């Protein structure tokens, strides 16, 4: 398969993720869209690494997946705390946590 197709797919996934973050108000959906954007970046890194014949992009993608795994643990803990206190996963309710 042509590397351009992978880059187009990466751009499409990133666009879908960005649209989801901007248009949705549910914290869990926004969280999944951010993860989709990170995976789109990983696909682009791996594609560029394959085109140039080195492992740098794959190493960066691996570290990005490690950071994303840590983000999932912390993010879901925060979302669950918001849901327990407000009975809603709406991000507009998250601004009320300061009071």
From Swiss-Prot:
The keyword Translocase applies. Pfam families: Oxidored_q2 (PF00420). Keywords: Cell membrane, Membrane, NAD, Quinone, Translocase, Transmembrane, Transmembrane helix, Transport. One of its GO terms (cellular component) is NADH dehydrogenase complex. It is a multi-pass membrane protein. GO terms for molecular function: NADH:ubiquinone reductase (non-electrogenic) activity; quinone binding. The keyword Transmembrane helix applies. One of its GO terms (biological process) is ATP synthesis coupled electron transport. NDH-1 is composed of 14 different subunits. Subunits NuoA, H, J, K, L, M, N constitute the membrane sector of the complex. NCBIfam families: PRK05715.1-2. This is NADH-quinone oxidoreductase subunit K.
């Amino acid at each position: 398969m042509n590397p351009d197709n992978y880059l187009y797919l990466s751009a499409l996934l990133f666009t879908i993720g960005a649209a989801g973050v901007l248009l949705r108000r549910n914290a869990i959906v926004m969280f999944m869209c951010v993860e989709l954007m990170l995976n789109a970046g990983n696909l682009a890194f791996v594609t560029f690494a394959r085109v140039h014949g080195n492992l740098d992009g794959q190493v960066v993608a691996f570290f990005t997946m490690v950071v994303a795994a840590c983000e999932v643990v912390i993010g879901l803990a925060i979302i669950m705390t918001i849901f327990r206190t407000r009975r809603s996963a709406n991000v507009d309710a998250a601004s009320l946590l300061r009071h």
